[in-house]
């Protein structure tokens, strides 16, 4: 049972005391969202992946309710033990198109970290997504300075160099209205 909850932080060291404090609070908050049920770990009904996003980048309250319900149902119905949760702090240096498991970059727009949940059966799950990805053994990282072109189907078509992350937000919003 000692290995049931293994929390790991990967990436850069906190830049200052304020960032260190926020990371500590975040990990405590994440742990509180996992509650053991009959020797298994399930997400509390109050769990909302949007809470993992910085406040100024968080979607409006109520946004993505359907995706949230699918996400929680998918995880809780798996009835597997959560063996670890790895928090990878997002840094410049890795491309949106290099995400493990073919993840949709739209799931991570605005996030400052990626949380990887590892279950007994092996899938990796991204917060805010109802998709389950098979493990690849790679860390999930994202480069906020490497914008990509995403078509109306959410597929990466090519990279746009020199565009701001705000422009990527705008492009995704345009695609959502098509």
Region roles according to the model:
Residues 1-178:
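C-terminal and inter-domain tail/linker signature
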């Amino acid at each position: 049972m000692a290995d049931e909850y293994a929390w790991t932080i990967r990436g850069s060291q906190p830049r200052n005391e304020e960032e260190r404090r926020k990371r500590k609070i975040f990990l405590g908050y994440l742990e509180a969202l996992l509650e053991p049920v009959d020797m298994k770990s399930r997400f509390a009904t109050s769990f909302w992946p949007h809470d993992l996003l910085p406040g100024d980048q968080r979607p409006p309250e109520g946004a993505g309710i359907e995706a949230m319900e699918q996400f929680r149902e998918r995880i809780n119905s798996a009835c597997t033990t959560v063996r670890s949760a790895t928090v990878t702090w997002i840094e410049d240096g890795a491309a949106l198109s290099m995400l493990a498991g073919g993840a949709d970059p739209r799931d991570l727009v605005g996030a400052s970290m990626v949380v990887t949940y590892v279950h007994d059966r092996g899938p990796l799950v991204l917060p805010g997504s109802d998709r389950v990805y098979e493990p690849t053994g790679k860390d999930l990282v994202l480069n906020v300075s490497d914008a990509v072109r995403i078509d109306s189907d959410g597929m990466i078509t090519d990279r746009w160099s020199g565009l701001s992350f705000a422009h990527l937000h705008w492009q995704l919003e345009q695609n959502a209205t098509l």
